[in-house]
């Protein structure tokens, strides 16, 4: 049977720092009680974090997730105000107004809202 949920796993060098970073952006964030793994939630979306201390030596180990949001511009402003690296949303030929958040480990959250 096929499930109804998907959660991308972002590799991170320092789990505690990554959890704090995402908390600062408005995510719910908690560490798995066994350590080495964490969970983020944001408006019904879940992203997992997996600790990989040697991540800096593996540039091929990055992940991307896409968030469908109501207002990409408002989200970009909020994340920029929190100090995040954000590429401001732009209109795309496929009808989305999209931006990109790049976390300190190089993982990306692309986010977009429908163009008017």
Q: What is each PLM-predicted segment?
A:
Residues 30-32, 89, 111:
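Residue-level detector of high-confidence beta-strand sites
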């Amino acid at each position: 049977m096929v499930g109804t949920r998907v959660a991308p796993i972002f590799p991170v060098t320092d789990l505690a720092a990554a959890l704090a970073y995402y908390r600062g952006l408005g995510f719910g964030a908690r560490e798995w009680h066994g350590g080495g793994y964490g969970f983020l939630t944001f408006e019904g979306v879940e992203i997992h974090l997996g600790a990989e201390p040697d991540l800096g030596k593996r540039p091929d180990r990055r992940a991307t997730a896409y968030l469908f949001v109501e207002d990409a511009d408002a989200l970009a402003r909020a994340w920029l105000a929190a100090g995040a690296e954000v590429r401001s949303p732009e209109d795309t030929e496929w009808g989305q107004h999209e931006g990109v958040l790049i976390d300190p480990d190089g993982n990306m959250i692309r986010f977009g809202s429908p163009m008017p």
